[in-house]
């Protein structure tokens, strides 16, 4: 695909194909993630048992791994599912929630990246930096006050990790090691909704299920998500984060390809 305007049409493909997205995600965001994927037009499944995750991953259009509330049992299930997805050619999307906050969390994120071929890694700057051994402060599972060139960081991480890297924040950055995209859509109220980033990772999974160009899938998903947030804020943002969350779920359903093309703000470098 030639440019992001064409990639925006992936939204229609997601809604037409209704891809199955297998999520091994955290307990905080499971319901929100499932509802968000349904609103988008994808079909979510949450399967965690090591005894079935390999089989389920092979049935899915994409596998999403999220270490937000990790434990040894779940990590082993992620590795089984990830390796099964690799065998079946199913793209694996990874959210290294809180990498850098604790040694266990950081080591787990790196272990998954080493043992599973990842298509896209989506995180904040601190999480991505800590995955490649660079210093960047982190507060709990949120990026701290670290300073640095996020564009350069995304490029380095993509090269070192062998995956498309999406660093999200006030401005989103997507890098595949050769080309970098800056996305300027979104709204500050997303930071007031628990699991907004986790749902975004699963939305990337839905787009990756219908488009094997991982960079295209990531850019299209981020622009769509950001435009939906802007539309939700315009309708309900003044009433606060609760009203925004409801409006955002609606916006995920009604935001169109034309909306994305009209309101998307993407710079290619």
Swiss-Prot record:
CDD domains, A to Z: THZ_kinase
The entry's keywords: ATP-binding, Kinase, Magnesium, Metal-binding, Nucleotide-binding, Thiamine biosynthesis, Transferase
Gene3D superfamilies: 3.40.1190.20
GO MF annotations in UniProt: ATP binding; hydroxyethylthiazole kinase activity; magnesium ion binding
UniProt key word Magnesium: yes
Cofactor: Mg(2+)
Entry-linked SUPFAM superfamilies: Ribokinase-like (SSF53613)
Residues bound to substrate: 46, 195
Entry binding sites for ATP: 122, 168
Annotated EC: 2.7.1.50
Enzyme class: transferase
One Gene Ontology term from the biological process aspect of the record: thiamine biosynthetic process
Physiological role: Catalyzes the phosphorylation of the hydroxyl group of 4-methyl-5-beta-hydroxyethylthiazole (THZ).
Family: Belongs to the Thz kinase family.
Identification of the protein by name: Hydroxyethylthiazole kinase
């Amino acid at each position: 695909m030639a440019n992001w305007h064409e990639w925006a049409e992936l939204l229609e493909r997601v809604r037409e194909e209704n891809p199955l997205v297998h999520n091994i995600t955290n307990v905080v965001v499971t319901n929100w993630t499932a509802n968000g994927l349904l609103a988008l037009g994808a079909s979510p499944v949450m399967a965690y048992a090591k005894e079935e995750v390999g089989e389920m991953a092979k049935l899915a259009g994409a596998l999403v791994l999220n270490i937000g509330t990790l434990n040894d049992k779940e990590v082993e299930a992620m590795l089984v599912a990830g390796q099964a997805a690799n065998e079946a050619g199913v793209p694996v999307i990874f959210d290294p929630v809180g990498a850098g906050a604790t040694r266990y969390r950081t080591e787990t994120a790196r272990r998954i990246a080493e043992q599973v071929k990842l298509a896209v890694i989506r995180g904040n700057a601190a999480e991505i930096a800590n995955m490649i051994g660079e210093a960047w402060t982190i507060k709990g599972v949120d990026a701290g006050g670290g300073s640095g060139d996020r564009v350069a960081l995304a490029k380095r991480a993509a090269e070192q990790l062998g995956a498309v890297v999406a660093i999200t924040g006030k401005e989103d950055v997507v890098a595949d090691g050769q080309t970098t995209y800056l996305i300027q859509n979104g709204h500050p109220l997303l930071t007031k909704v628990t699991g907004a980033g986790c749902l975004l990772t699963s939305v990337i999974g839905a787009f990756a299920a219908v488009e094997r160009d991982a960079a295209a899938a990531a850019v299209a998903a981020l622009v769509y998500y950001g435009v939906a947030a802007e539309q939700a804020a315009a309708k309900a943002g003044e009433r606060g984060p609760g009203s925004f969350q409801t409006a955002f779920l609606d916006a995920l359903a009604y935001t169109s390809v034309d909306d994305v093309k009209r309101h998307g703000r993407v710079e290619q470098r």
